[in-house]
Every structure is written in C-alpha cells, then in structure tokens.
C-alpha cells in the first residue's frame, strides 16, 4: 500500500511540473517570435499584435492591430462564425501549425515542432497580463486550460 501511495505521489508531482513549463526556456523560444511580437509594459504592435494577456484572450482583440481581412479561413471569418479564445489547447494547435488553425491568416511563421517548446512558450506568455504586468503564469495556464 505504501508503494502505491508513493507511486501516486510521484505521478502527481511529475504532472504538475510538466504542466508548469519553464520560463527561461519559454523566453528563449519567444526570441523567434520577438521579430514580429512584443510583450511587457512597453509592448507595441509590430508586424504582429502585442502578446500581453494572450493566454485566455479572445481572438482578434487587440485594438489598433489590423488582423487578416474577412474571407473564408481568416481570423475575422472564424470569429464571426464561432468566437474563439486563445486558450492553452487553441494556442498549442496554433503554435504547432498556424495555417491549420487559421488557413488564410497573415502570420508567416510555420510553427514549432517540439511540444515542450510550445508548452514553455505558452507558460512564458502567460506571465504577462493585458497591461504587460507580470502575474503568476501557472494560475493563468490552469484557468485557461479549464
């Protein structure tokens, strides 16, 4: 019985660590994104929208950023048909293959092949609220995953 309880404890501890992500590794992955996107209190739209508060944010919600124009398969059309939120599941799919999620979106990035890089990037982005202030990323990820 003690062995079962110990094994269960290790299993639970392992899953918590795996879902938490690594901020330093996520920041390193974000460097690929930083050409077009910014985060933090002084973030500004560039080629891509600012990513403050992206985890849990509705699609197309950054004022002043020109998203892909309407038409089948674009962000605007998808929003009108079925409003979406950038939750963990949607972000994971998008970061793996952006064109699969938004076929006619204007983001040129082809995606991240490694699941761990995606997990770490989402965790890194989750630390920024809508104003770019730092918050607990684990709480944001947990709320977004539910």
Q: Where are the regions that the model predicts?
A:
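Sec-dependent N-terminal signal peptides
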Residues: 3-15
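C-terminal capping alpha-helices of c-type cytochrome domains
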Residues: 85-138
